[in-house]
């Protein structure tokens, strides 16, 4: 999978001859396309597309308006039109999941085949303490440690005695790279995104697989489940993974891939 850059925007356009289908990946806040390299390798007989949004990966921020959710929606819409993409499965993680849902109200029926959501941003996030949200771009080592515990189940057991050293080093890298994104965490911006996502969820008309860690500390599972149940939409299938937090693919890759494989097989029947 080769990343390209055009006008400061990094993207992947990786078509496969005799494809089984097309997948467009929408990354998480401070994430990037390369987070799903092994996913792309597993589904090598699918064409794979994605954008690193401004401030992510090697994509440049020309001005702050490029961090607006609606700007990201327009970028994807332009990409779909440029490459004449049709029958695409949108796959979004966290804010990328919310973006996938919002796109269902902008892209055409011809362009979307189905949706895969990994711990998607949804109105259930209102139950998450504001201190966790604001720390997604951390100010202190303690902020960073709290977010890591919310992201990955039992992360301290994974790292053992190295956990605090890991956090101290990574926090500094995080601040250097992602400080410009802190504006996206402002309550007004966050609420505008949620209202847009909520409206799109209420009109969702595509088969959707929603995979969510039951120990997620960023977008909490039970409030998200309650929100989903309030929609009464039989097209959305929710799968909660135990002993898993916000990074379900990273934490439970085999189970995640199996669920996605089953979903894609259903779509292709």
Curated annotation (Swiss-Prot):
One GO cellular component term: membrane
Active site: 27, 94
GO molecular function terms noted in the UniProt entry: carboxylic ester hydrolase activity
A Pfam family per the record: Hydrolase_4
Domain of life: Bacteria
Chain segments annotated as transmembrane: none
InterPro entries for this protein: AB_hydrolase_fold, AB_hydrolase_sf, Hydrolase_4
EC main group: hydrolase
Protein name, entry field: Putative esterase/lipase 1
Organism: Mycoplasma pneumoniae (strain ATCC 29342 / M129 / Subtype 1)
């Amino acid at each position: 999978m080769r990343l390209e850059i055009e006008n400061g925007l990094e993207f992947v356009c990786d078509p496969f001859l005799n494809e089984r289908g097309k997948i467009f990946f929408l990354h998480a806040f401070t994430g990037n396309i390369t987070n799903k390299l092994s996913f792309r390798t597993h589904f090598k007989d699918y064409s794979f597309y994605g954008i690193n949004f401004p401030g992510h990966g090697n994509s440049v921020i020309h001005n702050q308006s490029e961090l607006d959710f609606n700007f990201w929606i327009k970028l994807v819409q332009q990409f779909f039109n440029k490459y004449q993409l049709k029958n695409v499965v949108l796959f979004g993680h966290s804010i990328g999941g919310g973006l996938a849902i919002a796109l269902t109200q902008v892209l055409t029926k011809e362009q979307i085949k189905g949706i895969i959501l990994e711990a998607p941003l949804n109105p259930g996030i209102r139950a998450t303490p504001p201190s966790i949200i604001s720390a997604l771009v951390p100010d202190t080592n303690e902020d960073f440690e709290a977010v890591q515990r919310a992201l990955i189940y039992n992360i301290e057991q994974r790292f053992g005695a190295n956990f605090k050293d890991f956090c101290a080093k990574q926090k500094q890298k995080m601040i250097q790279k992602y400080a410009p994104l802190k504006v996206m965490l402002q309550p007004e911006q966050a609420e505008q995104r949620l209202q847009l996502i909520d409206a799109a969820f209420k009109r969702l008309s595509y088969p959707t697989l929603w995979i969510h860690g039951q120990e997620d500390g960023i977008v909490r599972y039970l409030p998200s489940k309650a929100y989903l149940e309030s929609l009464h939409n039989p097209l959305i299938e929710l799968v909660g993974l135990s002993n898993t937090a916000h990074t379900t693919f990273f934490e439970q890759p085999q189970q995640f891939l199996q669920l996605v494989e089953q979903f894609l097989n259903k779509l292709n029947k």
